[in-house]
Amino acid sequence: MAKQKIRIRLKAFEHRILDQSADKIVETAKRTGASISGPIPLPTERTLYTVLRSPHKHKDSREQFEMRTHKRLIDIVNPTPKTVDSLMKLDLPSGVDIEIKL
């Protein structure tokens, strides 16, 4: 029988919230008897926006805004039905984007 694997990718702008969510997922998976690898920190995506400070004049005066997207990867190997059920019921903060691949 082939090994099953659940791959969870987490994305958030705040790294503290992201790490707390990853810890909750890891704790839940370990409690239900699944083996786990991660959380693995993935490269932070940095988006830079440059805008003019004044509405129509002074092109040399600009302001830069930065948006950082932090990412983590968690692999759950050989999940039990109890693991999947408890992960579905897990309550995570609204600022965390979750992608799950089976």
UniProtKB/Swiss-Prot annotation:
Part of the 30S ribosomal subunit. GO terms for biological process: translation. Involved in the binding of tRNA to the ribosomes. Belongs to the universal ribosomal protein uS10 family. Keywords: Ribonucleoprotein, Ribosomal protein. The keyword Ribosomal protein applies. It comes from Latilactobacillus sakei subsp. sakei (strain 23K) (Lactobacillus sakei subsp. sakei). GO terms for cellular component: ribonucleoprotein complex; ribosome. This is Small ribosomal subunit protein uS10. GO terms for molecular function: structural constituent of ribosome; tRNA binding. It comes from the Bacteria. PANTHER family: 30S RIBOSOMAL PROTEIN S10 FAMILY MEMBER.
